[in-house]
Amino acid sequence: MIANKYDLISKIGAGAFGAIYKGQNIRTGEPVAIKVEPLKHETNLLKNEARIYQYLKGGTGIPQVKWFGVDDTNNYMVINLLGESLQHNINTYGTFSLLNAIAIGVQMIERIQYVHECGLIHRDVKPDNFLFGLNEQRDRLYIIDFGFCKKCNNPQTTTPTTTPTTAPPKKMTSILGTPNYISISVHDYIEPNKHDDLESILYTIMYLYYGRLPWDTPGITNTEIRNMKQVLLYGAGTATTIPKIFTQFAYILSTYREKSNEPNYKSLLELLNMFTNAK
């Protein structure tokens, strides 16, 4: 029992930080998820994650922290129990129709827009990090795992009458995130910004539709993945090889990346909603 209030029932997941358990509030019977992180971890990932959830509290699709605490051996975080991840859905049930993949994409953009408006960049957008709710929330998408999250760094400045001025982009010494889903810029070791979260959403939508991304090949190099993404989205002839909505999404992203540090969420959402409403 944890905090004289929560019982551990069964292990439902694991990660670099430790383990995730299904639990129950013994006073109310409410099902919960309990993350357990051994204190031997010097980074305190779980404590940082709890702080971020508290900071984002109140946003649609943000897990609710019900309790955080420490004992002699572990950090504990209790949040509302969620359903299956997008990745689990693919593994278990197969791919989504294009219509459903796009509808899920709308929710992903809405979640990321809220995170960005709160001054944060997620930096690890992928199917594992979006979960559906349970029961009456089963159609609502939740965003999780803010281990790579960082405050926004916006080197561009604009005024209504001037062209954006851009400081040299910050370079990284290693790739950050999951190679299948990171942006082309991150493949170039450029520190992620808001646009990169949205580009990762595009690759996630494509994955939901195809079930496998074309660069998901054993032994493929970072440069090869980067070049395949570049050719697929911006190369000649792509309009005949992938659904047009994917190249339209990429065009909006690239256009506004050049103009401003602020993505055009409105245009992206209009594009996806126009597609779903037409079906």
Model-derived segments and their meaning:
Residues 19:
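Conserved N-lobe ATP-binding subsite of Hanks-type protein kinase domains
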Residues 25-47:
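ATP-binding glycine-rich loop module of kinase domains
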Residues 116-133:
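Catalytic-loop of the protein kinase fold
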